[in-house]
Swiss-Prot record:
It comes from the Bacteria. Keywords: Allosteric enzyme, Glycosyltransferase, GTP-binding, Magnesium, Nucleotide-binding, Transferase. This is Uracil phosphoribosyltransferase. Allosterically activated by GTP. 5-phospho-alpha-D-ribose 1-diphosphate binds at R79, R104, D131, P132, M133, L134, A135, T136, G137, G138, S139, D200. It comes from Finegoldia magna (strain ATCC 29328 / DSM 20472 / WAL 2508) (Peptostreptococcus magnus).
């Protein structure tokens, strides 16, 4: 079974509280999503391997450590996932970015794919899938399945808020995918929205309804 990491860092909790507030405007909402993504990135990359290298400082030579040739990919689930990309790229500037467009059918609550663009060598990369919300888990499950069909083997899922139902879905379908969430909420309501949640992340990011 995959590992689920729920963050308890004070900065993340503080920013998440402001993010939830219905009075937080789109500009601040976008900034907070990016900042939370950056903070989460440190834990998501904790298991990255390092290799020794020699570096010369202005004073003398020393042995340092760098990431050991790891090729990375950040894949947002459109459209809300776009809000987390810059936060990850600020820490991982060499990562390539792919895009998977999914929307949730309001009647069936199942994901429908409408767009996909991935790096040519995506199967060689460790992939970080980002989406602010993990509700039913349908979109995340579909995106991960799609990536595996393209040869991806090492995949992590990063969400700002998740419902237990979504985590259960992903763990059942993809027990090899570790999940990282900033906040684990109570449940889904009858409309498939996370409670208490933060509303529609895409609408709040981009100022749409």
């Amino acid at each position: 079974m995959s590992k689920v990491t729920v963050f308890d860092h004070p900065l993340i909790k503080h920013k998440l509280t402001i993010l939830r507030d219905k009075n937080t405007g789109s500009n601040q909402f976008r900034q907070l999503v990016s900042e939370i993504a950056t903070l989460m990135c440190y834990e998501v990359t904790r298991d990255f391997k390092l290799e020794d290298c020699e570096v010369e400082t202005p004073i003398g030579k020393t042995t340092g450590q760098t990431l050991s040739g790891k090729k990375l990919g950040v894949v947002p689930i459109l459209r809300a996932g776009l809000g987390m990309v810059e936060g990850f790229l600020s820490v991982l500037p060499a990562a390539k970015v792919g895009h998977i467009g999914l929307y949730r059918d309001p009647k069936t609550l199942k994901p429908v794919e409408y767009y996909c663009k991935l790096p040519k060598d995506v199967e060689e990369r460790d992939i970080i899938v980002v989406d602010p919300m993990l509700a039913t888990g349908g979109s995340a499950e579909a995106a991960i399945t799609f990536l595996k069909e393209h040869g991806c083997k090492n995949i992590k899922l990063v969400n700002i808020i998740a419902a237990p139902e979504g985590i259960k879905m992903v763990q059942e379908k993809h027990p090899d995918v570790d999940i990282y969430v900033a906040g684990l909420d109570e449940k889904l309501n009858d409309h498939g929205y996370i409670v208490p949640g933060l509303g529609d992340a895409g609408d709040r990011l981009f100022g749409t309804k």
